[in-house]
Protein backbone atom coordinates (compact mmCIF):
# COMPACT_ATOMS: atom_id res chain seq x y z
CA UNK A 1 0.00 0.00 0.00
CA UNK A 2 1.41 3.38 -1.06
CA UNK A 3 1.14 6.22 1.43
CA UNK A 4 0.10 9.52 -0.12
CA UNK A 5 2.83 12.13 0.15
CA UNK A 6 2.32 15.42 1.95
CA UNK A 7 2.11 18.38 -0.43
CA UNK A 8 4.19 21.19 1.08
CA UNK A 9 2.16 23.77 -0.86
CA UNK A 10 -0.66 23.09 1.61
CA UNK A 11 1.26 24.83 4.43
CA UNK A 12 1.75 28.49 5.23
CA UNK A 13 4.92 29.37 7.17
CA UNK A 14 3.42 28.54 10.57
CA UNK A 15 2.03 25.23 9.35
CA UNK A 16 5.29 24.29 7.63
CA UNK A 17 7.34 25.02 10.77
CA UNK A 18 4.96 22.85 12.80
CA UNK A 19 5.12 20.03 10.25
CA UNK A 20 8.92 20.06 10.18
CA UNK A 21 9.13 19.99 13.98
CA UNK A 22 6.41 17.44 14.72
CA UNK A 23 6.53 15.13 11.70
CA UNK A 24 10.12 15.39 10.50
CA UNK A 25 11.90 16.17 13.77
CA UNK A 26 13.64 19.14 12.15
CA UNK A 27 14.32 22.66 13.35
CA UNK A 28 12.02 25.46 12.23
CA UNK A 29 14.67 27.27 10.20
CA UNK A 30 14.86 24.25 7.89
CA UNK A 31 11.19 24.74 7.04
CA UNK A 32 11.91 28.35 6.16
CA UNK A 33 14.82 27.36 3.93
CA UNK A 34 12.58 24.98 2.01
CA UNK A 35 9.79 27.56 1.79
CA UNK A 36 12.22 30.04 0.24
CA UNK A 37 13.25 27.47 -2.37
CA UNK A 38 9.63 26.77 -3.24
CA UNK A 39 8.44 30.35 -3.68
CA UNK A 40 11.53 32.46 -4.39
CA UNK A 41 13.08 30.04 -6.85
CA UNK A 42 10.01 28.13 -8.07
CA UNK A 43 11.70 24.88 -7.08
CA UNK A 44 9.77 21.61 -6.87
CA UNK A 45 12.79 19.28 -6.77
CA UNK A 46 14.30 18.62 -3.33
CA UNK A 47 17.62 17.57 -4.90
CA UNK A 48 18.13 21.11 -6.21
CA UNK A 49 17.95 22.59 -2.70
CA UNK A 50 21.71 22.73 -2.25
CA UNK A 51 21.76 24.35 1.20
CA UNK A 52 19.67 21.48 2.62
CA UNK A 53 21.64 18.49 3.93
CA UNK A 54 21.30 15.20 2.07
CA UNK A 55 19.69 13.40 5.01
CA UNK A 56 16.83 15.91 5.13
CA UNK A 57 16.48 15.90 1.35
CA UNK A 58 16.06 12.12 1.41
CA UNK A 59 13.51 12.40 4.21
CA UNK A 60 11.58 15.01 2.25
CA UNK A 61 11.62 12.91 -0.93
CA UNK A 62 10.27 9.93 1.00
CA UNK A 63 7.42 11.75 2.73
CA UNK A 64 6.68 14.96 0.84
CA UNK A 65 6.12 16.53 -2.55
CA UNK A 66 5.74 19.98 -4.07
CA UNK A 67 2.81 19.61 -6.46
CA UNK A 68 1.03 22.54 -8.07
CA UNK A 69 -1.82 22.33 -10.59
CA UNK A 70 -0.50 21.87 -14.10
CA UNK A 71 -1.55 23.72 -17.23
CA UNK A 72 -3.83 21.57 -19.36
CA UNK A 73 -4.52 24.34 -21.87
CA UNK A 74 -3.32 27.89 -22.50
CA UNK A 75 -5.09 30.55 -24.56
CA UNK A 76 -3.49 33.84 -25.55
CA UNK A 77 -5.52 36.98 -26.20
CA UNK A 78 -4.61 39.63 -28.72
CA UNK A 79 -4.29 42.11 -25.82
CA UNK A 80 -1.65 40.00 -24.01
CA UNK A 81 -4.02 38.33 -21.55
CA UNK A 82 -3.38 34.62 -20.97
CA UNK A 83 -6.01 32.17 -19.72
CA UNK A 84 -4.74 28.91 -18.31
CA UNK A 85 -6.89 25.86 -17.61
CA UNK A 86 -5.27 24.51 -14.45
CA UNK A 87 -5.80 20.82 -13.74
CA UNK A 88 -6.90 20.10 -10.16
CA UNK A 89 -7.62 16.41 -9.66
CA UNK A 90 -9.89 15.34 -12.51
CA UNK A 91 -11.21 18.83 -13.31
CA UNK A 92 -10.01 22.24 -14.49
CA UNK A 93 -10.22 25.68 -12.98
CA UNK A 94 -9.25 28.81 -14.87
CA UNK A 95 -6.52 31.30 -13.98
CA UNK A 96 -6.02 34.53 -15.90
CA UNK A 97 -2.86 36.64 -16.33
CA UNK A 98 -3.60 40.28 -17.20
CA UNK A 99 -0.58 42.44 -18.12
CA UNK A 100 -0.80 46.23 -18.06
CA UNK A 101 1.71 49.05 -18.44
CA UNK A 102 2.50 49.31 -14.73
CA UNK A 103 1.47 45.92 -13.34
CA UNK A 104 0.58 42.32 -14.08
CA UNK A 105 -2.46 40.93 -12.31
CA UNK A 106 -3.25 37.26 -11.77
CA UNK A 107 -6.93 36.33 -11.35
CA UNK A 108 -7.12 33.21 -9.17
CA UNK A 109 -9.93 30.69 -8.58
CA UNK A 110 -10.98 29.51 -5.10
CA UNK A 111 -13.49 26.75 -5.94
CA UNK A 112 -14.26 24.26 -8.68
CA UNK A 113 -17.42 25.92 -9.97
CA UNK A 114 -19.64 28.05 -7.74
CA UNK A 115 -22.84 27.46 -5.77
CA UNK A 116 -24.07 31.05 -5.61
CA UNK A 117 -26.02 30.97 -8.88
CA UNK A 118 -25.55 34.64 -9.80
CA UNK A 119 -27.67 34.96 -12.94
CA UNK A 120 -25.16 36.97 -14.99
CA UNK A 121 -22.07 34.81 -14.33
CA UNK A 122 -20.92 32.01 -16.59
CA UNK A 123 -19.14 30.19 -13.75
CA UNK A 124 -22.42 29.93 -11.83
CA UNK A 125 -24.03 28.07 -14.72
CA UNK A 126 -21.47 25.26 -14.30
CA UNK A 127 -22.68 24.39 -10.80
CA UNK A 128 -20.45 23.62 -7.82
CA UNK A 129 -18.14 20.68 -7.20
CA UNK A 130 -15.75 21.40 -4.33
CA UNK A 131 -13.48 23.84 -2.54
CA UNK A 132 -9.88 24.11 -3.69
CA UNK A 133 -7.13 23.12 -1.26
CA UNK A 134 -4.45 25.59 -0.17
CA UNK A 135 -2.04 23.93 -2.61
CA UNK A 136 -4.53 24.36 -5.45
CA UNK A 137 -5.06 28.06 -4.72
CA UNK A 138 -1.46 29.10 -4.08
CA UNK A 139 -0.40 26.55 -6.69
CA UNK A 140 -2.11 28.64 -9.37
CA UNK A 141 0.16 31.55 -8.44
CA UNK A 142 3.22 29.27 -8.30
CA UNK A 143 2.44 27.71 -11.68
CA UNK A 144 1.65 31.05 -13.32
CA UNK A 145 4.89 32.56 -12.02
CA UNK A 146 6.80 29.63 -13.49
CA UNK A 147 4.99 29.89 -16.84
CA UNK A 148 5.75 33.61 -17.04
CA UNK A 149 9.34 32.94 -16.02
CA UNK A 150 9.70 30.52 -18.91
CA UNK A 151 8.71 33.33 -21.30
CA UNK A 152 11.24 35.92 -20.09
CA UNK A 153 12.42 36.50 -23.63
CA UNK A 154 8.93 37.79 -24.49
CA UNK A 155 9.30 40.58 -21.95
CA UNK A 156 6.27 39.52 -19.93
CA UNK A 157 5.97 41.41 -16.68
CA UNK A 158 6.24 39.32 -13.48
CA UNK A 159 3.08 39.02 -11.38
CA UNK A 160 2.66 42.10 -9.18
CA UNK A 161 -0.98 41.75 -8.08
CA UNK A 162 -3.31 38.87 -7.23
CA UNK A 163 -7.09 39.12 -7.25
CA UNK A 164 -9.33 36.38 -5.87
CA UNK A 165 -11.89 36.95 -8.60
CA UNK A 166 -11.70 33.69 -10.53
CA UNK A 167 -14.08 30.76 -10.25
CA UNK A 168 -15.93 30.40 -6.95
CA UNK A 169 -16.77 32.49 -3.88
CA UNK A 170 -13.56 32.88 -1.83
CA UNK A 171 -15.31 33.45 1.50
CA UNK A 172 -17.06 30.09 1.26
CA UNK A 173 -13.60 28.49 1.40
CA UNK A 174 -12.09 30.26 4.40
CA UNK A 175 -10.19 27.22 5.67
CA UNK A 176 -8.03 27.17 2.54
CA UNK A 177 -8.22 30.83 1.54
CA UNK A 178 -6.55 32.29 4.65
CA UNK A 179 -3.35 30.17 4.50
CA UNK A 180 -3.09 30.83 0.76
CA UNK A 181 -3.34 34.58 1.38
CA UNK A 182 -0.71 34.30 4.12
CA UNK A 183 1.70 32.71 1.65
CA UNK A 184 1.05 35.45 -0.91
CA UNK A 185 1.93 38.10 1.69
CA UNK A 186 4.80 36.27 3.42
CA UNK A 187 8.34 37.46 2.66
CA UNK A 188 9.32 33.81 2.31
CA UNK A 189 6.35 33.27 0.01
CA UNK A 190 5.52 35.66 -2.83
CA UNK A 191 6.07 38.75 -0.68
CA UNK A 192 3.22 40.76 -2.17
CA UNK A 193 2.04 43.95 -0.52
CA UNK A 194 -1.33 43.59 1.23
CA UNK A 195 -2.58 46.38 -1.02
CA UNK A 196 -1.75 44.24 -4.06
CA UNK A 197 -3.79 41.22 -2.95
CA UNK A 198 -7.55 41.61 -3.37
CA UNK A 199 -10.35 39.35 -2.18
CA UNK A 200 -13.71 39.78 -3.87
CA UNK A 201 -16.93 38.56 -2.26
CA UNK A 202 -20.55 38.41 -3.34
CA UNK A 203 -21.71 39.03 0.20
CA UNK A 204 -20.76 36.15 2.51
CA UNK A 205 -21.14 38.12 5.72
CA UNK A 206 -19.99 35.27 7.98
CA UNK A 207 -16.71 34.96 6.06
CA UNK A 208 -16.04 38.68 6.13
CA UNK A 209 -16.68 38.65 9.88
CA UNK A 210 -13.92 36.03 10.20
CA UNK A 211 -11.50 38.15 8.17
CA UNK A 212 -11.73 41.10 10.57
CA UNK A 213 -8.55 41.07 12.63
CA UNK A 214 -7.33 37.84 10.99
CA UNK A 215 -6.09 38.93 7.57
CA UNK A 216 -5.63 42.38 6.06
CA UNK A 217 -5.92 42.56 2.27
CA UNK A 218 -7.71 44.77 -0.21
CA UNK A 219 -11.45 44.12 -0.42
CA UNK A 220 -13.78 44.28 -3.41
CA UNK A 221 -17.49 43.63 -3.08
CA UNK A 222 -19.79 42.37 -5.82
CA UNK A 223 -22.89 44.52 -5.32
CA UNK A 224 -24.45 44.73 -8.81
CA UNK A 225 -27.81 46.19 -7.72
CA UNK A 226 -28.96 49.26 -5.76
CA UNK A 227 -31.79 47.58 -3.83
CA UNK A 228 -32.66 44.23 -2.27
CA UNK A 229 -35.48 43.38 -4.69
CA UNK A 230 -33.32 43.60 -7.80
CA UNK A 231 -30.26 42.12 -6.11
CA UNK A 232 -32.20 39.07 -4.96
CA UNK A 233 -33.42 38.53 -8.52
CA UNK A 234 -29.91 38.41 -9.98
CA UNK A 235 -27.94 37.29 -6.89
CA UNK A 236 -29.80 34.72 -4.73
CA UNK A 237 -27.24 35.14 -1.92
CA UNK A 238 -29.02 38.40 -1.11
CA UNK A 239 -31.90 36.38 0.36
CA UNK A 240 -29.52 35.14 3.03
CA UNK A 241 -27.52 38.34 3.66
CA UNK A 242 -29.20 41.49 2.39
CA UNK A 243 -27.49 44.70 1.31
CA UNK A 244 -27.77 46.38 4.72
CA UNK A 245 -26.14 43.42 6.51
CA UNK A 246 -23.46 43.20 3.81
CA UNK A 247 -22.49 46.87 3.87
CA UNK A 248 -22.48 46.98 7.67
CA UNK A 249 -19.76 44.33 7.93
CA UNK A 250 -17.91 45.87 4.96
CA UNK A 251 -17.66 49.18 6.83
CA UNK A 252 -16.30 47.39 9.89
CA UNK A 253 -13.72 45.51 7.82
CA UNK A 254 -12.34 48.59 6.08
CA UNK A 255 -12.25 50.46 9.41
CA UNK A 256 -9.98 47.70 10.75
CA UNK A 257 -7.85 47.50 7.59
CA UNK A 258 -4.72 49.32 6.46
CA UNK A 259 -4.71 47.63 3.05
CA UNK A 260 -7.88 49.37 1.90
CA UNK A 261 -6.80 52.90 2.82
CA UNK A 262 -10.26 53.56 4.21
CA UNK A 263 -12.16 52.62 1.03
CA UNK A 264 -13.69 49.47 -0.43
CA UNK A 265 -13.99 48.77 -4.15
CA UNK A 266 -17.62 48.30 -5.16
CA UNK A 267 -18.03 46.17 -8.29
CA UNK A 268 -21.17 46.76 -10.34
CA UNK A 269 -21.83 44.80 -13.53
CA UNK A 270 -23.95 46.77 -15.98
CA UNK A 271 -26.74 44.70 -17.54
CA UNK A 272 -28.62 46.33 -20.39
CA UNK A 273 -32.04 47.61 -19.22
CA UNK A 274 -31.80 45.58 -16.00
CA UNK A 275 -29.70 47.59 -13.53
CA UNK A 276 -28.19 50.32 -15.70
CA UNK A 277 -30.89 53.01 -15.72
CA UNK A 278 -30.42 56.55 -14.46
CA UNK A 279 -32.80 55.75 -11.60
CA UNK A 280 -30.53 52.85 -10.61
CA UNK A 281 -27.51 55.14 -10.61
CA UNK A 282 -29.23 57.67 -8.32
CA UNK A 283 -30.34 54.87 -5.99
CA UNK A 284 -26.86 53.35 -5.91
CA UNK A 285 -25.25 56.70 -5.14
CA UNK A 286 -27.62 57.26 -2.22
CA UNK A 287 -27.10 53.70 -0.96
CA UNK A 288 -23.33 54.12 -0.82
CA UNK A 289 -23.25 57.54 0.84
CA UNK A 290 -22.32 56.01 4.19
CA UNK A 291 -19.74 53.59 2.80
CA UNK A 292 -16.33 55.01 1.83
CA UNK A 293 -15.73 53.48 -1.58
CA UNK A 294 -14.66 53.68 -5.17
CA UNK A 295 -17.09 52.25 -7.71
CA UNK A 296 -15.87 50.03 -10.53
CA UNK A 297 -18.43 49.66 -13.32
CA UNK A 298 -18.14 46.44 -15.34
CA UNK A 299 -19.93 46.36 -18.69
CA UNK A 300 -21.43 42.88 -19.01
CA UNK A 301 -19.29 40.34 -20.86
CA UNK A 302 -21.61 38.06 -22.88
CA UNK A 303 -21.32 34.28 -22.83
CA UNK A 304 -23.28 31.60 -24.75
CA UNK A 305 -26.84 31.16 -23.49
CA UNK A 306 -26.91 34.28 -21.35
CA UNK A 307 -30.18 36.28 -21.38
CA UNK A 308 -28.31 39.53 -20.68
CA UNK A 309 -26.65 42.05 -22.97
CA UNK A 310 -23.94 44.66 -22.63
CA UNK A 311 -25.40 48.20 -22.44
CA UNK A 312 -24.66 50.74 -25.14
CA UNK A 313 -21.74 53.09 -24.58
CA UNK A 314 -24.18 55.97 -24.09
CA UNK A 315 -25.99 54.14 -21.27
CA UNK A 316 -22.68 53.24 -19.61
CA UNK A 317 -21.48 56.84 -19.89
CA UNK A 318 -24.73 58.22 -18.49
CA UNK A 319 -24.62 55.82 -15.53
CA UNK A 320 -21.06 56.86 -14.68
CA UNK A 321 -21.79 60.58 -14.95
CA UNK A 322 -24.87 60.26 -12.75
CA UNK A 323 -22.82 58.60 -10.00
CA UNK A 324 -20.12 61.25 -10.28
CA UNK A 325 -22.68 63.95 -9.53
CA UNK A 326 -22.59 62.57 -5.97
CA UNK A 327 -18.79 62.98 -5.81
CA UNK A 328 -18.15 59.25 -5.93
CA UNK A 329 -14.95 58.00 -7.55
CA UNK A 330 -16.18 55.95 -10.52
CA UNK A 331 -14.15 53.94 -13.02
CA UNK A 332 -15.16 51.72 -15.92
CA UNK A 333 -13.29 48.43 -16.06
CA UNK A 334 -11.46 47.91 -19.31
CA UNK A 335 -12.48 44.57 -20.79
CA UNK A 336 -9.49 42.27 -21.15
CA UNK A 337 -9.29 38.82 -22.70
CA UNK A 338 -12.88 38.67 -23.93
CA UNK A 339 -11.71 37.14 -27.22
CA UNK A 340 -10.66 34.03 -25.25
CA UNK A 341 -13.57 34.17 -22.74
CA UNK A 342 -11.22 35.32 -19.98
CA UNK A 343 -13.08 38.49 -19.03
CA UNK A 344 -15.04 39.05 -15.83
CA UNK A 345 -17.93 36.58 -15.53
CA UNK A 346 -16.77 34.37 -18.41
CA UNK A 347 -14.68 31.73 -16.60
CA UNK A 348 -16.06 28.20 -16.75
CA UNK A 349 -13.29 25.59 -16.40
CA UNK A 350 -14.21 21.91 -16.45
CA UNK A 351 -16.61 21.23 -13.59
CA UNK A 352 -18.43 18.08 -12.52
CA UNK A 353 -21.55 19.66 -11.03
CA UNK A 354 -22.52 18.24 -7.65
CA UNK A 355 -25.04 20.92 -6.59
CA UNK A 356 -27.89 19.19 -8.37
CA UNK A 357 -27.23 15.91 -6.56
CA UNK A 358 -27.56 17.15 -2.99
CA UNK A 359 -29.93 19.35 -1.02
CA UNK A 360 -27.17 21.12 0.87
CA UNK A 361 -23.46 21.78 0.61
CA UNK A 362 -21.07 21.77 3.54
CA UNK A 363 -18.93 24.91 3.69
CA UNK A 364 -16.37 25.07 6.51
CA UNK A 365 -18.62 23.06 8.78
CA UNK A 366 -21.80 25.01 8.01
CA UNK A 367 -24.56 23.43 5.95
CA UNK A 368 -25.96 26.00 3.53
CA UNK A 369 -28.95 24.97 1.40
CA UNK A 370 -28.14 25.68 -2.22
CA UNK A 371 -31.57 27.09 -2.96
CA UNK A 372 -31.22 29.72 -0.21
CA UNK A 373 -27.78 30.87 -1.26
UniProtKB/Swiss-Prot annotation:
[4Fe-4S] cluster binds at residues 114, 118, 121. GO terms for molecular function: 4 iron, 4 sulfur cluster binding; metal ion binding; rRNA (adenine(2503)-C2-)-methyltransferase activity; rRNA binding; tRNA (adenine(37)-C2)-methyltransferase activity; tRNA binding. Disulfide bonds join 107-344. S-adenosyl-L-methionine binds at residues 168-169, 200, 222-224, 301. Its EC number is 2.1.1.192. The keyword rRNA processing applies. Specifically methylates position 2 of adenine 2503 in 23S rRNA and position 2 of adenine 37 in tRNAs. m2A2503 modification seems to play a crucial role in the proofreading step occurring at the peptidyl transferase center and thus would serve to optimize ribosomal fidelity. Reaction proceeds by a ping-pong mechanism involving intermediate methylation of a conserved cysteine residue. This is Dual-specificity RNA methyltransferase RlmN. It comes from Vibrio cholerae serotype O1 (strain ATCC 39315 / El Tor Inaba N16961). The gene is rlmN.
Amino acid sequence: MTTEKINLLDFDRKGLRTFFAEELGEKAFRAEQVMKWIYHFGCDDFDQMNNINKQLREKLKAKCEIRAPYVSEAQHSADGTIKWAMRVGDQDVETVYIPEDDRATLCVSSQVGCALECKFCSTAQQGFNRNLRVSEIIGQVWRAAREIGLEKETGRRPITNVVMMGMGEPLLNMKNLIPALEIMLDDLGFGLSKRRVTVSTSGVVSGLEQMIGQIDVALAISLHAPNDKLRSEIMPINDRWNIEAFLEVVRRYIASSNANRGKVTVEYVLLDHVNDGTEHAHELAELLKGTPCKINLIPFNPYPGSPYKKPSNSRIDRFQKTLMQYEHTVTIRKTRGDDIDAACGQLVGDVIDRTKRTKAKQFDGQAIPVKTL
